[in-house]
Amino acid sequence: MELEEEENPRKRKETPNSALTTELDRPSWDVQDPEPQAKKARLSTILFTDNCEVTHRQLCELLKYAILGKSTLPKPSWCQLLHQKQLNNVVVFILKGMSQLHFYRFYLEFRFLRKTFRHKFSLPPPTSSFLFDIIGLQKKKSARGCPRTVEGPLISATLKSSIDLQNDPIIQKYGYKNVSLTRCLLTKEEMKTFHFPLQGSPNCENFILLKYSGFITDSSPLFGLDCEVCLTSMGKELTRISLVAEGGYCLMDELVKPDFKILDYLTSFSGITKEILNPVTTKLKDVQKLLRELLPPDAVLVGHCLDLDLRVLKIIHPYVIDTSLLYIGKQGRRFKLTFLAKVILGKDIQCPNKLGHDGIEDARTALELVQYFLKYGPKKIAEFNLEALAANQEQGNKEGATHMRSVLECLDSMGQKLLFLTQDIDELSSYRNCQTVKCSSNKEVLEQARVEVPLFPFNIVQFSFRPFPPLFAEEMKNNMKTRWTEMSTIYAGPFSKDCNVGSLKKVFSSLGPVQSITLVLETYRPYFSIQYELLEAAQLAIETMNGTILEGSCIRVHRLLTELTLECDTLVRELEQDSENQGTIYVAGIGETFKEHLLEQSNLFPDLEAVILPKELKSRKQKNYCFLKFKTFNSAQVALEVLKGKDWKLKGRNALTSRHLQAWLKNIHPEPSMPMGLRIVPPLLERHIFRTLKANHPKIVAWRWSRRIEKLYHSLSPGTFCLILLPGTKNTFGSHPGLGLMKIKEEEGGDTLL
């Protein structure tokens, strides 16, 4: 479950709650500055989702908030930016052509980035409009089109002639004729794209599956669903569920008591207060059980941004209709429920003079929107011209800045300009408040940045690099998977020939999840190859088991030395010192009561920010390890000694792998996927390329530009919000996700985690 700021609206975000883990960065209402007069801007990530992926729209959300602040905009949904007014300026470095694969393949070379930027997250592969998605820069359109600019007038919604039905996204998806209920259901691929919980997904181990049949028809019943949440010490938890049947009849409207201490009731959005929730005894498990009893096997759940509701409920259901996607706008725009209710149904909901949302009203509204769509069809919806209506509403709104969709518009509203330094501007439109400087090389971009960046409140500094050739990228990706597998595999022995294999498995499994134990047949005395799920477990086995007496034998525990593990010790050491892993410890051998025991003795673990407790995929049983994240490195070390002591008798060590890295490694496919029928001349393989390290080799490029960005970073003034984006790559042969790193620069010497 993710922790969000007190004023973050539940339905404003795109990234779902984490079902497995939570980062409990100290929220703004719990931060006490030792000297109130010395407030500083600070970042506090919430570790967003299970794979720590942040969408491009969410990046834009954060950047807009960095410019305008909470007086005009809602707070970001996926992280906390504390004391935004103390920011001096914003600098976004874009390393075009680089991806998460670059960063972890050349992890040792990116020394400055990994040691300095504590907050890292995955990015989806870039679209063709990457800059537009995060900043508001738009590619030039053909002469037949009408390019939209910051200065350009907004289209009038009252002119029927202005409606372009053919290019309306609803028409493009559904056509002109009325559609059936089953046609409106989200496909499995769409559910995956929009982060719905799915059976078998690594982030849904502890979710329950609602009963469902393999047959669904156009007569299957619809049920409107809406949830409200609060913020607790374990993140975001359910406080109210509303379920409505067709006809508007309310089947369920239950208050729910969270399992953990409530930090913020989010009353302005949920309407829930301490007094309301105090007498409640209903728990999440009770709601889950009731849903399984109430809903028939062919039930279709309907909601607005329904993925968020399902995740907070920790349920999986294959039959869903999401009104934010049913009434989709251009470029994937998702309209607010209040807007659709007013335009389509002609009614006002979530009135500003009313405290909190009415869950029944929201669920009923979503249900009515689906029924309207089914009755009148896509053509009728397209004729509303939702894009134009929304644009007019935003233009006429006195608080229009709240609805601004681009960073450029936010800057323009404050009379400020954006500086854009790049080699590639030919395909971009010009904007009155964007000063673009075209450079001939990355080196010139760097030189211009040193001079120009201090003069502008918002800066985009884009360096361009040649992406990896497809086959080279595939080989590197496969090598990465192999390297981590080999690093997570240990060899233990020799044992006696009559050793108890079950006993050995139990001993080694106590250090972390084991994927396989294999008897090595090439040795005279038995050795075992043990592959762990986590690098931490393998490293812990080497550190604690090597040289011990087991089954009557003194054993050696070590890794196999291969080309890919030659620098394993160095890599482990550097991973341990990664700023994201500082303050995080890995603990093995825990039982089901560990969490309760931990909370009961919380006084022994000051500065505890996160408890990460993964569960088994099928049984939903808690695994025998966890990660504990602390505010400081010192607090983590104190806690580690306590947990390894005589009272707790657990084993552990400093963390090595962040959650986004674990998720990325799991998703690396071993075989390349290429279009059929294409004959490709393979480039030189990686091992041959590395024999001659030329100046433009990726390894040298990574090292050189990490150093150059370091120098540029140190030239920035304190209070600068620095965001580094490796956007990822996307082409005919496949895609590679990107990586984001962010930090607010402090005074020199104050940037390290103590």
From Swiss-Prot:
Residue ranges, annotated region (Disordered): 1-36
Entry-linked InterPro entries: Exonuclease_RNaseT/DNA_pol3, Nucleotide-bd_a/b_plait_sf, RBD_domain_sf, REX1-like_exo, REXO1/3/4-like, RNaseH-like_sf, RNaseH_sf, RRM_dom
Cross-referenced Pfam families: RNase_T, RRM_1
CDD domains membership: REX1_like
Gene Ontology MF terms: exonuclease activity; RNA binding
Keyword Hydrolase included in the entry's annotation: yes
UniProt EC number: 3.1.-.-
UniProt domain RRM: residue ranges: 488-562, 583-662
GO process annotations (BP): rRNA 3'-end processing
Entries under SMART domains matching the protein: EXOIII, RRM
Domain Exonuclease: 222-370
Cited PROSITE patterns: RRM
Keyword terms, alphabetized: Exonuclease, Hydrolase, Nuclease, Repeat, RNA-binding
Entries under PANTHER family matching the protein: RNA EXONUCLEASE 5, RNA EXONUCLEASE REXO1 / RECO3 FAMILY MEMBER-RELATED
Record-given protein name: RNA exonuclease 5
Organism, scientific name: Rattus norvegicus (Rat)
